[in-house]
């Protein structure tokens, strides 16, 4: 996702129902338009210096830069043998990779986008992996159901972020963890940090990853641009390039200039 002029306009809607209604339209549109067999990840990319060089299956190689972000975020905690919930799982590529690579006991991917969930259920069929439709601010699970919650590049779309954090706390078992990565306008980082401080989550780590995200976007840029040009009509291509992450777009200038802060966190439930 990108915080672009579109996001700036939507931000004026604040915590209104209009905000969520826009995303309920936008994500299914992108699922239908962006070639569902090609785009299993809708997060931006990530690469370190020197490169991470993860050992990947041949089928995962085209998505290396996207997988890097999932791997680095998720491995802030130990997933092996744990009950995992990913909130806003997109097209399920990250859920599939983490299930295969890190061996959780179970992995549940949740998303508000019905077209995305239908795609996930068709495309990613693995033992212990399931996908359900649901709202990040009203999770359809019992208290203390999960050991780890994963949330990557999604919460900036939630109109009531503190409500999401409260739901994370509710569904985590005592001692459970949140592995999290997202972005905010730099002038909103203080509010972001206050929301974390007011939750029942203890911050274990935090770092800004603008440089790594920009490096990943650069490595993926031509592939992403070609994908948008193939599948979107001309009037949607500007928004599509911002959404998917292409070098030289407004998002990359915001990241380079520091107007956006992309951060990775880990938290534990008190």
Swiss-Prot record:
EC number of the protein: 2.1.1.-
One of the record's GO molecular function terms: S-adenosylmethionine-dependent methyltransferase activity
Entry superkingdom: Bacteria
NCBIfam families: PthPhpthDimycoMt
Protein name: Phthiotriol/phenolphthiotriol dimycocerosates methyltransferase
InterPro entries: Methyltransf_11, Methyltransf_Superfamily, PthPhpthDimycoMt, SAM-dependent_MTases_sf
Keywords noted in UniProt: Lipid biosynthesis, Lipid metabolism, Methyltransferase, Transferase
């Amino acid at each position: 996702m990108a915080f672009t002029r579109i996001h700036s306009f939507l931000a004026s809607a604040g915590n209104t129902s209009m905000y969520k209604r826009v995303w309920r339209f936008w994500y299914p549109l992108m699922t239908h338009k962006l070639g569902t067999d090609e785009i299993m990840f809708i997060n931006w990319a990530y690469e370190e210096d020197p490169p991470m060089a993860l050992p990947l299956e041949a089928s995962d190689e085209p998505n290396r830069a996207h997988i890097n972000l999932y791997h680095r975020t998720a491995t802030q905690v130990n997933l092996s043998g744990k009950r995992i919930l990913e909130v806003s799982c997109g097209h399920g590529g990250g859920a599939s990779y983490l299930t295969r690579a890190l061996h959780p006991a179970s992995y549940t991917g949740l998303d508000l986008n019905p077209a995305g969930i239908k795609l996930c259920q068709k495309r990613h069929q693995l033992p212990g992996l399931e996908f359900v439709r649901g709202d990040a601010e009203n999770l359809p699970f019992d208290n203390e159901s999960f050991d780890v919650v994963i949330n990557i590049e999604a919460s900036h779309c939630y109109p009531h972020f503190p409500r999401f954090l409260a739901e994370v706390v509710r569904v985590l078992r005592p001692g459970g963890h949140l592995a999290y990565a997202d972005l905010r306008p730099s002038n909103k980082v203080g509010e972001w940090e206050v929301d974390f401080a007011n939750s029942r989550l203890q911050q274990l780590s935090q770092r800004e990853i603008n440089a790594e995200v920009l490096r990943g976007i650069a490595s993926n840029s031509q592939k992403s641009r070609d994908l948008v040009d193939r599948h979107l009509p001309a009037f949607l291509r500007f928004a599509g390039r911002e959404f998917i992450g292409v070098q030289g777009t407004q998002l990359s200038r915001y990241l380079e200039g520091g107007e956006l802060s992309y951060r990775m966190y880990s938290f534990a439930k008190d």
